[in-house]
Structure formats: structure tokens, C-alpha cells
Amino acid sequence: MKIGIDTMGGDNAPSSVIEGVAIYLTQNTQDNVVLFGNKSVIEKECVDRIKDLSRVEIVDCKEKIEFDDEPVKAIRQKKDSSIVVGLKYLKEKQIDAFVSAGSTGALMAGGLLIVGRIKGIDRPALTTKLPYKSGQYLLIDVGSNTDCRPINILQFAQMATVYASKVLGKNNPTVGLLNIGTEETKGNDLSKQSYEILKNAKNINFVGNVEARDLPFSPPDIVVCDGFVGNIVLKLTEGFGLLFFDILKDIAKLSLKAKIGGLLLKPYLKNLKGKYDYKEVGGAPLLGIDGIVIKCHGSSDGQAIFNGINQAKTFYENNVLELLKEEITAESEV
């Protein structure tokens, strides 16, 4: 497998990106990578980290898309940026997948304008796994579409259903619509109209509305919403995870008994922390693009980048893209 990686995207790039690539290549000895970015900088980062440079191709890119760039304008004007060149390689099938911790908007715009959509999908969407008390659920969309129509919500649910069943092994996964109440009549116009279209859809296991307070305890397998709401849920979940462990650290400092208790609980808390750490998830697949695109967190470190690349590999090995195309095409022709 050959995976393309944007070395210029993210708060800690390129150092953290190359660190993640080095870990990946060490553990996946049959795979190759194509690194997009400033060649001289990449070469310096690679020298001390990657032993077998024969498995590394570097594509020199003179431009970089910043997080505050207007996405569509940046894609059209910065033709020699790591995101644009990387997505062109994906479109031309010179790489099997593309991973980036760069601008979400630019990745979305570039995916649409350069790679193109799966037939039958109006808008691609980002999905990620979030923790709850006894497992994980899929949340879609987590930031690529701030304004949606009911048909978009339906397509998000359809794509997430394929992903959950084929990659996560969920049998007939349940789908819930994130709303301000469980009653069918609750919510704004988008929520009410989306409820109707989801309720009448034959290819998803819709179980009704789900409230945000239920997400940490008993969510359905898939929770669907627009990207504005989804991104808030994602970042609030991350924030509460960090807050919880900060509070525990403060409590452990209160007394000797508290410190001893903290030491006894440390192995269990370490496992719990992993559930709430975005680094362990790695990245969010951009479902609906006619290619494998993984968006990593903007503040990703090496471990998070490594997990994001691993996610691209899992997507590829499970043939998810072709399964999505088959499922969505079949539904659009009904």
C-alpha cells in the first residue's frame, strides 16, 4: 500500500507528522509513503527518524494552506500546496489514501473539486468514534458541513451505516438523530424534516431522536447531525475528558490518603484516559469522497498521526470505499 501524507498540515508539522510516519513504517514493513511538503525541511526531519528511506518518496510543494485561508479560494490559488498536490495524486491513483492534519475546510473543498464525490452523495461528511460509558459510537458530521438539508442528514446516516457495519463490525447498527428532545415533534425545521426522511428510509435502522445528555451513557451506534452541532459535541467531549483528569490530579494533591488512592487507581485511569484521548482515534474519514481521505486533529502529535495513517490502512484493507459506492449507488437507483 502507498499512503500520501501532508507534512505541512497541523500545529506541530512537520516534526510530529514525520514522527508518526516513522512509527508507521517501522510497524508496516511492506508499505510505502509519499510525503508532500517542503522537500528540504522533510529531508532534515527524516534523516534521524526513518531508517529505510527507500520506502519514502518526497514531493516538493512550495505553498502551504493556512488554517485561516478561505478554503475554496486556497484550493484554486495555491496549486503547489501539499493538500492540492496530495489530492491530485489521490485522484490520479498514484497513492491509495491521503492523510492530513491541515485545514478541514480546504480538505473538504479539495476533496470535492479535485477528487470528486461518490455518485449519489451531495456532500461528504467527517465521522469519528467518540467514547461512552461502555464503548464507542460514531458521530457524523463532525465539522465539514455547517449548514445541511434533510437529504444530507440521510446520506450521512447511510454512509455511517456502511462504515459501522463493514469496519467496526456492527450488525444492523442503530441510527439516532441528535436533537433537543426525544419526541418526534422536537427541534428546528431541519430536525423535524430529517426525522421524517430518516423514519421512512429502508436501508438504515433508525431509532429516533437522541438527546446530548444520553451520549455518555447509552447512545445508538451512530449519531447523525449537521457539522456545526457535531463539531461542538466533538470538542466538548474532548474538553470534558481533559477536565475530568485535571480534577482528579487536583484531588490527588489534597492529602496523603488521596495521593495513595490515586496511585492505586493509576493503571485503571490510564486505560480510561485512552478512551477520551483524540490521539488514540487518529483521524476522521471524509466519507463521500471518491478516494480515501483521513483528517487528523489539527494539534496531532506523532502518535495521533500514526493512528490516522493506520486508519487509512484499515479503510483500504476493508475495501470500504468500494462498499460505500456500491451501497449508495444501489440506493440512489431505487
UniProtKB/Swiss-Prot annotation:
Keyword Cell membrane attached: no
Top-level division of the source organism's lineage: Bacteria
GO biological process, one term: phospholipid biosynthetic process
The EC number(s) this enzyme carries: 2.3.1.274
Function comment: Catalyzes the reversible formation of acyl-phosphate (acyl-PO(4)) from acyl-[acyl-carrier-protein] (acyl-ACP). This enzyme utilizes acyl-ACP as fatty acyl donor, but not acyl-CoA.
A GO CC annotation given for this chain: cytoplasm
Keyword Transferase on entry: yes
NCBIfam families: plsX
Keyword tags: Cytoplasm, Lipid biosynthesis, Lipid metabolism, Phospholipid biosynthesis, Phospholipid metabolism, Transferase
Protein location: Cytoplasm
Pfam families hit by this protein: FA_synthesis
Gene3D superfamilies per record: Isopropylmalate Dehydrogenase (3.40.718.10)
GO MF, any single term: phosphate:acyl-[acyl carrier protein] acyltransferase activity
Descriptive protein name: Phosphate acyltransferase
Gene designation: plsX
InterPro entries registered for this protein in UniProt: FA_synthesis, Phospholipid_synth_PlsX-like
Coiled coil (residue ranges): none
Main localization of the protein described in the UniProt heading: cytoplasm
